[in-house]
Protein backbone atom coordinates (compact mmCIF):
# COMPACT_ATOMS: atom_id res chain seq x y z
CA UNK A 1 0.00 0.00 0.00
CA UNK A 2 0.94 3.62 0.48
CA UNK A 3 1.72 3.40 4.18
CA UNK A 4 4.87 5.15 5.38
CA UNK A 5 5.95 2.10 7.37
CA UNK A 6 7.01 -1.45 6.46
CA UNK A 7 6.52 -3.97 9.26
CA UNK A 8 8.29 -7.23 10.07
CA UNK A 9 7.08 -8.83 13.26
CA UNK A 10 5.74 -11.67 15.37
CA UNK A 11 3.36 -10.00 17.78
CA UNK A 12 1.75 -12.02 20.57
CA UNK A 13 -0.92 -9.85 22.23
CA UNK A 14 -2.04 -10.43 25.80
CA UNK A 15 -5.71 -10.12 24.82
CA UNK A 16 -6.95 -12.87 22.48
CA UNK A 17 -3.42 -14.29 22.32
CA UNK A 18 -2.52 -15.59 18.88
CA UNK A 19 0.64 -14.81 16.88
CA UNK A 20 0.24 -11.91 14.46
CA UNK A 21 2.94 -12.09 11.81
CA UNK A 22 3.85 -9.29 9.39
CA UNK A 23 6.10 -9.49 6.34
CA UNK A 24 6.99 -6.78 3.82
CA UNK A 25 7.47 -6.69 0.05
CA UNK A 26 9.81 -4.23 -1.67
CA UNK A 27 10.46 -3.95 -5.41
CA UNK A 28 13.01 -1.90 -7.34
CA UNK A 29 12.61 -1.33 -11.12
CA UNK A 30 14.27 -4.02 -13.23
CA UNK A 31 15.00 -1.46 -15.95
CA UNK A 32 17.17 0.55 -13.55
CA UNK A 33 19.04 -2.56 -12.42
CA UNK A 34 19.76 -3.64 -16.01
CA UNK A 35 20.81 -0.11 -16.98
CA UNK A 36 23.18 0.11 -14.02
CA UNK A 37 24.95 -3.10 -14.99
CA UNK A 38 24.99 -2.41 -18.72
CA UNK A 39 26.15 1.20 -18.62
CA UNK A 40 27.97 1.63 -15.32
CA UNK A 41 29.13 -1.58 -13.67
CA UNK A 42 30.25 -3.45 -16.78
CA UNK A 43 32.92 -5.99 -15.94
CA UNK A 44 33.91 -4.30 -12.67
CA UNK A 45 33.85 -6.05 -9.32
CA UNK A 46 30.64 -5.13 -7.53
CA UNK A 47 28.49 -5.74 -4.48
CA UNK A 48 24.86 -5.03 -3.65
CA UNK A 49 23.02 -4.36 -0.39
CA UNK A 50 19.40 -3.84 0.60
CA UNK A 51 19.17 -0.98 3.08
CA UNK A 52 16.14 -0.32 5.28
CA UNK A 53 16.10 2.36 7.94
CA UNK A 54 14.47 1.76 11.29
CA UNK A 55 11.53 3.82 12.52
CA UNK A 56 10.79 1.80 15.66
CA UNK A 57 11.84 -1.50 17.23
CA UNK A 58 10.42 -3.46 20.15
CA UNK A 59 10.87 -6.90 21.66
CA UNK A 60 14.28 -7.55 20.12
CA UNK A 61 16.13 -10.63 21.34
CA UNK A 62 19.85 -11.30 21.08
CA UNK A 63 19.38 -13.30 17.88
CA UNK A 64 16.47 -11.69 16.06
CA UNK A 65 17.09 -12.70 12.44
CA UNK A 66 15.76 -10.98 9.34
CA UNK A 67 15.63 -13.03 6.14
CA UNK A 68 15.35 -11.69 2.58
CA UNK A 69 14.17 -13.75 -0.40
CA UNK A 70 13.22 -12.96 -4.00
CA UNK A 71 9.45 -12.99 -4.47
CA UNK A 72 8.41 -15.61 -7.04
CA UNK A 73 5.28 -14.00 -8.48
CA UNK A 74 3.79 -10.64 -9.42
CA UNK A 75 1.74 -8.58 -6.97
CA UNK A 76 -0.05 -5.24 -6.78
CA UNK A 77 1.07 -2.58 -4.33
CA UNK A 78 -2.39 -1.09 -3.80
CA UNK A 79 -3.28 2.22 -2.16
CA UNK A 80 -4.16 1.18 1.38
CA UNK A 81 -2.74 2.55 4.61
CA UNK A 82 -2.68 1.28 8.17
CA UNK A 83 -6.02 1.64 9.98
CA UNK A 84 -7.95 2.67 6.84
CA UNK A 85 -11.67 2.68 7.57
CA UNK A 86 -13.18 1.13 5.57
CA UNK A 87 -10.24 -1.16 4.83
CA UNK A 88 -8.67 -0.67 1.38
CA UNK A 89 -8.45 -4.05 -0.34
CA UNK A 90 -7.04 -3.20 -3.79
CA UNK A 91 -3.52 -4.45 -3.15
CA UNK A 92 -1.40 -7.35 -1.99
CA UNK A 93 -2.35 -9.01 1.28
CA UNK A 94 -1.45 -12.06 3.34
CA UNK A 95 -3.70 -14.23 1.20
CA UNK A 96 -3.85 -12.49 -2.18
CA UNK A 97 -1.31 -11.12 -4.66
CA UNK A 98 -3.47 -8.45 -6.27
CA UNK A 99 -6.60 -7.57 -4.31
CA UNK A 100 -8.99 -9.18 -1.88
CA UNK A 101 -9.96 -12.70 -2.98
CA UNK A 102 -8.09 -12.42 -6.30
CA UNK A 103 -4.92 -14.21 -7.37
CA UNK A 104 -4.22 -16.05 -4.15
CA UNK A 105 -0.65 -16.82 -3.18
CA UNK A 106 0.18 -20.51 -3.43
CA UNK A 107 1.26 -20.24 0.20
CA UNK A 108 -0.41 -17.73 2.51
CA UNK A 109 2.00 -14.98 3.45
CA UNK A 110 3.62 -14.78 0.02
CA UNK A 111 5.56 -17.00 -2.37
CA UNK A 112 9.33 -16.70 -2.59
CA UNK A 113 12.34 -18.61 -3.91
CA UNK A 114 14.21 -20.40 -1.15
CA UNK A 115 17.22 -21.11 -3.39
CA UNK A 116 18.33 -17.49 -2.92
CA UNK A 117 18.39 -15.79 0.45
CA UNK A 118 20.20 -13.26 2.59
CA UNK A 119 20.01 -12.49 6.28
CA UNK A 120 21.04 -10.17 9.09
CA UNK A 121 21.04 -10.81 12.83
CA UNK A 122 19.86 -7.93 15.00
CA UNK A 123 20.84 -7.80 18.64
CA UNK A 124 19.56 -5.87 21.61
CA UNK A 125 22.32 -3.26 21.45
CA UNK A 126 23.16 -3.38 17.74
CA UNK A 127 22.00 -1.00 15.04
CA UNK A 128 18.48 -1.92 13.88
CA UNK A 129 18.89 -0.56 10.35
CA UNK A 130 19.18 -3.31 7.76
CA UNK A 131 22.22 -3.48 5.50
CA UNK A 132 21.94 -6.94 3.94
CA UNK A 133 24.19 -8.33 1.21
CA UNK A 134 21.75 -9.34 -1.55
CA UNK A 135 24.36 -9.83 -4.26
CA UNK A 136 23.26 -13.41 -4.93
CA UNK A 137 19.72 -12.24 -5.72
CA UNK A 138 20.75 -9.20 -7.77
CA UNK A 139 23.12 -11.41 -9.77
CA UNK A 140 20.16 -13.49 -10.94
CA UNK A 141 18.06 -10.42 -11.73
CA UNK A 142 20.86 -8.69 -13.64
CA UNK A 143 21.36 -11.81 -15.76
CA UNK A 144 17.58 -12.21 -16.19
CA UNK A 145 17.84 -15.73 -14.79
CA UNK A 146 14.86 -15.11 -12.52
CA UNK A 147 12.11 -12.51 -12.80
CA UNK A 148 12.36 -9.48 -10.56
CA UNK A 149 9.23 -9.42 -8.42
CA UNK A 150 11.04 -7.74 -5.55
CA UNK A 151 12.20 -8.79 -2.11
CA UNK A 152 10.31 -10.55 0.66
CA UNK A 153 11.51 -9.30 4.06
CA UNK A 154 10.52 -11.47 7.02
CA UNK A 155 11.64 -12.97 10.29
CA UNK A 156 13.41 -16.30 10.09
CA UNK A 157 10.99 -19.22 10.21
CA UNK A 158 11.70 -20.19 13.81
CA UNK A 159 10.73 -16.68 14.97
CA UNK A 160 7.38 -16.52 13.18
CA UNK A 161 4.09 -17.84 14.60
CA UNK A 162 5.64 -18.20 18.04
CA UNK A 163 3.07 -18.31 20.83
CA UNK A 164 5.23 -16.73 23.50
CA UNK A 165 5.43 -13.26 24.96
CA UNK A 166 9.21 -13.79 25.12
CA UNK A 167 9.47 -13.92 21.31
CA UNK A 168 7.68 -11.00 19.75
CA UNK A 169 10.06 -8.76 17.81
CA UNK A 170 8.29 -5.83 16.17
CA UNK A 171 10.34 -3.95 13.58
CA UNK A 172 9.07 -0.93 11.67
CA UNK A 173 11.06 0.43 8.73
CA UNK A 174 10.46 3.48 6.56
CA UNK A 175 8.84 2.72 3.21
CA UNK A 176 9.19 4.54 -0.11
CA UNK A 177 6.16 6.60 0.93
CA UNK A 178 7.88 8.01 4.00
CA UNK A 179 8.04 11.76 4.49
CA UNK A 180 11.60 11.38 5.72
CA UNK A 181 14.89 11.07 3.84
CA UNK A 182 15.10 7.35 4.66
CA UNK A 183 13.30 5.34 1.96
CA UNK A 184 14.50 1.80 1.15
CA UNK A 185 17.67 1.66 -0.94
CA UNK A 186 19.08 -1.01 -3.23
CA UNK A 187 22.75 -0.07 -3.22
CA UNK A 188 25.04 -1.33 -5.98
CA UNK A 189 28.72 -0.51 -5.56
CA UNK A 190 31.49 -1.20 -8.03
CA UNK A 191 35.19 -0.51 -8.48
CA UNK A 192 35.93 1.07 -11.85
CA UNK A 193 39.29 2.50 -10.86
CA UNK A 194 42.27 2.09 -13.16
CA UNK A 195 45.94 2.82 -12.98
CA UNK A 196 48.95 3.11 -15.24
CA UNK A 197 52.39 1.84 -14.40
CA UNK A 198 55.09 4.44 -14.72
CA UNK A 199 58.72 4.08 -15.67
CA UNK A 200 61.81 5.39 -13.96
CA UNK A 201 65.06 6.30 -15.58
CA UNK A 202 68.34 5.79 -13.80
CA UNK A 203 69.81 9.03 -12.55
CA UNK A 204 73.46 9.41 -13.28
CA UNK A 205 75.60 10.74 -10.45
CA UNK A 206 78.45 11.75 -12.72
Which residue ranges define each predicted feature?
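A short beta-strand-loop element at or near the start of a globular domain
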Residues: 1-59
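Cysteine-clustered segments with highest specificity for TGF-beta superfamily mature ligands
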Residues: 1-12, 29-30, 49-52, 90-192
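Short beta-strand/loop motifs in extracellular/secreted proteins, especially
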Residues: 24, 64-66, 184
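Short edge-strand/loop segments of extracellular domains
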Residues: 51-94, 155-159, 176
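Short helix/loop capping segments that flank catalytic or ligand/cofactor-binding pockets
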Residues: 77-79, 162, 196-198
Amino acid sequence: GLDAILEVNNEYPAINPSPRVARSLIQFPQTQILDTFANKVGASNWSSSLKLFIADAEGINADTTIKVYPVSGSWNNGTGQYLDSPITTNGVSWGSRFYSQSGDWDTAGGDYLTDYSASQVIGIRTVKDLNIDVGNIVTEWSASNIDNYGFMVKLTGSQEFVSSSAVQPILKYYSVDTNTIYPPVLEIKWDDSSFETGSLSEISTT
